[in-house]
Amino acid sequence: MRTLFGSLFVFAALLLGITSVQAQMTAPPGYYKDQKVVYHNDGGAPDNAAYFRKLLTNIKNHIDAVGKDHVEIRVVDHGDGLIMFQLANNDPDLAHRIDALKAEGVKFLICSNTLRERHIDWHTLYGVKEDDLVPSGVAELARLQQMGYVYIHP
């Protein structure tokens, strides 16, 4: 009986070690080709804050995997997706994540239709500049896909 438990313990330890190595695995150089990607952010109710953190983490992981010089990322924000920039005004962690991704070259694009329909002044959205505004979020998603961007909706 002791031998059985001892063997199971060793097996479990080995399995955990393998899992740990896999979690730290990085792609070899050249594994990923250059990429153009558009992420679709329309919010994640009922817990928008958790959804936004997951979205930004996915984007960061994407950049880390491919390399910032090998990926061009746009994030089209419309509907409840604009809540991310409202929350970031009072959430330093969320603001930092947005800023860090911008520093990596990520461009956040804001839907003017949503601004108009919800009576939101873009000046009140964290880090948004006039150049970030697009006429229509969904039309921008289609335009970017026509330009060869791969669509991702986490």
Language model region names:
Residues 1-5:
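Positively charged n-region of N-terminal signal peptides that target proteins for export
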Residues 7-17:
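Bacterial N-terminal signal peptides
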Residues 18-23:
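Sec/Tat signal peptide C-region and signal peptidase I cleavage site
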Residues 30-46, 76-80:
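Acidic/histidine-rich, surface-exposed loop or edge segments in extracytoplasmic proteins
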Residues 41-55, 85, 89:
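Short, glycine-rich nucleotide/cofactor-binding loops
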Residues 51-67:
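Histidine-anchored nucleotide/phosphate-binding helix
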Residues 72-86, 114:
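Acidic helix-start/capping segments at beta-turn-to-alpha-helix junctions
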Residues 87-154:
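A cross-taxonomic marker for long C-terminal extensions/tails that follow the last structured domain
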